[in-house]
Amino acid sequence: MKVAKDLVVSLAYQVRTEDGVLVDESPVSAPLDYLHGHGSLISGLETALEGHEVGDKFDVAVGANDAYGQYDENLVQRVPKDVFMGVDELQVGMRFLAETDQGPVPVEITAVEDDHVVVDGNHMLAGQNLKFNVEVVAIREATEEELAHGHVHGAHDHHHDHDHDGCCGGHGHDHGHEHGGEGCCGGKGNGGCGCH
């Protein structure tokens, strides 16, 4: 079976920045499962996987435009500190979901001032070209429920209390390994491992 739309694919991968810094990985023992062709991965990686088979190992370079896009200065904002009422101590590096007209957007605090906080809504890998080392671990047919929901369901029973067709990580689902709240495989703004 070859990687194609509507199939569930299990990937082991490492991703590095152009200068070789490892930013994320998912080993063979805990692969990333995703529904191919549903925007669950960044477009450059999903395109590169098309047609591959179980056991295929390959490297792929994904440019910023096919990953998380270019860095957008308009996504950096200075907001009043009282927006964060209920948070005891605001620190640089803290991440939050900001409610916007387009829905929740992950932001990171980049500066804390006397009465204001500077937040950045860019993905942590925006503007970066990425290098992936990938292994296709498994491929299977998706269930009707997975196709209807637009994402993979884990080994345990998966119930939904939402009415959107979200995808792994991008809308609050977890695929079983840690990305520090961001992740690197997620599709731009609408899914994948990453929140953004």
Curated annotation (Swiss-Prot):
UniProt keyword annotation of NAD present: no
A GO molecular-function annotation: zinc ion binding
> Mind listing the GO biological process terms from this record?
protein maturation; protein refolding; protein stabilization; response to heat
Q: Which residues form the PPIase FKBP-type domain?
A: 1-95
UniProt EC number: 5.2.1.8
Which positions are annotated as binding Ni(2+)? C167, C168, C184, C185, C193, C195
Give the residue ranges for region: IF-chaperone.
76-120
Q: Please tell me where this protein is predominantly located.
A: cytoplasm
* Location of this chain's protein in the cell: Cytoplasm
Coiled coil stretches, renumbered = none
Q: Which reaction does it catalyse?
A: [protein]-peptidylproline (omega=180) = [protein]-peptidylproline (omega=0)
What extra comment accompanies this record?
A: The activity of SlyD is considerably smaller than the one found in other PPIases with the same substrate.
The family line of this record is: Belongs to the FKBP-type PPIase family.
Know the name of this protein?
A: FKBP-type peptidyl-prolyl cis-trans isomerase SlyD
State the species of origin. Escherichia coli (strain K12)
